[in-house]
Amino acid sequence: TKERWMARLFSLYFDDHTRLSLFANANNVNETQTPGTEGDWQPSNSPQGQTTTRLVGLHLDTEDKNKVVTDNIDATATWTDAVDEMRSASESFASGGNIFRRSMSLNRQKDFRASLQNNMRLRTGNIGMTSWTSLDYSNSRNNANSRKATYDNDPSRFGSIKEVLDSTFFADTNPLLSMITNRSQSISLDRYRSFSASQDTWAFYKLPWGDRLEININGTYS
């Protein structure tokens, strides 16, 4: 549609020992996926609301010419802005008079996430080592606003759902005020950050008589 947009970038370099891909994705059509190593994009499943995404990343596989050391790196940075808005109008039939309801909610979630994974392996002679490193950082903010009200007469003549609720909560003098039987509003603001890191290293040394010494070191932080 007129207000929907999408832009993608995928770049690939490779030689006998290195394969590097760079990618970017910017859109407001709820697409949050990253491509595969061949540049194939898989669709996301986010049917509700509207999410604007900006994403950049890289994938690297490399080795030395003797294949003694191999290294694999994945890194991404993602900014998302998700907006979910709901409006409803209903009428309940009752013996004492019909009850008219109007409600509206707006939820906005803004997130930033950066991640890095590195897997390195070394194999030469009697020595071997594998190192796995993972880093994750996220920063999120959520704003939510919900309004609802009930009336003893049909408020449709005062306008749309939004216009009726605006008059219900913000107008000092209005014919609509005499029709209100109940109203409530909820506003919330949440913000949180997180960081986690993990490291797992395994190494061995093969002794001349065939036995093998092994060591494993791992740690996490969050």
Language-model regions, residue ranges each:
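Primarily recognizes Gram-negative and organellar outer-membrane beta-barrels
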Residues: 1-5, 17-222
